């Protein structure tokens, strides 16, 4: 409950199928943290494996992934505006990328990745992840977080909202709003609204 304003949900995928399975994934408008405890997935668009544990940035296109063996993965799905509060990094740096946790130069995050991949019990893994983020949250003093929370309330309430209305909800100038939004959400307001509209169209 304490982390619910920051983490939308966790999901765990396990599959021992011997035959490779292909899946098309679409943008969901949220950044994610992915821990592969089994075999990594193969990115068919990029012709490479996903990193073992990585930060998944915002993207606007679909991606085709292929299993390469036994799948066991834990994914943390952040609230759209909350990743910066938990990772302490401007998240626009991850736009369109899957960045290995070891490449972020964050020793605590690398240690978490190792702990999760070395722990067999997934409930214990979730507990380790939550303890890590609670420590991060108490060390974060981002005054723009409440502004971004208000912006996303407006997006959820008004399907056809525009960017000037969002910058007004954030009490920021258009230029300031664009910069703060990218720092917290990992993409531009225009691109994010496009993702939201695509998601709504997919689930109509």
For each predicted feature, which ranges?
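Terminal helix-turn-helix DNA-binding modules in bacterial transcription factors
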Residues: 184-188, 192-204
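Alpha-helical bundle regulatory/interaction domains
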Residues: 1-149, 153-164, 168-174, 187-188, ...
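Residues within the DNA-recognition helix of helix-turn-helix
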Residues: 180
């Amino acid at each position: 409950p304490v982390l619910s304003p920051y983490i939308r949900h966790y999901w765990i995928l396990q599959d021992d199928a011997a035959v490779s399975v292909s899946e098309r994934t679409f943008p969901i408008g949220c950044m994610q943290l992915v821990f592969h405890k089994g075999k990594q997935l193969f990115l068919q668009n990029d012709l490479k494996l996903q990193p073992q544990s990585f930060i998944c940035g915002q993207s606007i296109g679909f991606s085709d992934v292929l299993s390469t063996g036994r799948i066991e993965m834990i994914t943390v799905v952040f609230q759209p505006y909350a990743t910066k509060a938990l990772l302490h990094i401007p998240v626009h740096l991850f736009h369109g990328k899957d960045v290995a946790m070891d490449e972020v130069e964050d020793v605590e995050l690398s240690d978490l990745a190792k702990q999760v991949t070395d722990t067999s019990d997934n409930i214990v893994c979730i507990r380790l992840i939550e303890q890590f983020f609670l420590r991060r949250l108490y060390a974060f003093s981002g005054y723009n977080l409440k502004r971004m929370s208000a912006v996303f309330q407006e997006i959820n309430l008004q399907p056809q909202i525009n960017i000037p209305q969002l910058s007004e909800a954030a009490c920021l100038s258009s230029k300031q709003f664009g910069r703060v939004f990218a720092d917290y959400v990992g993409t531009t307001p225009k691109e994010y609204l496009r993702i939201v509209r695509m998601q709504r169209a997919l689930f109509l």
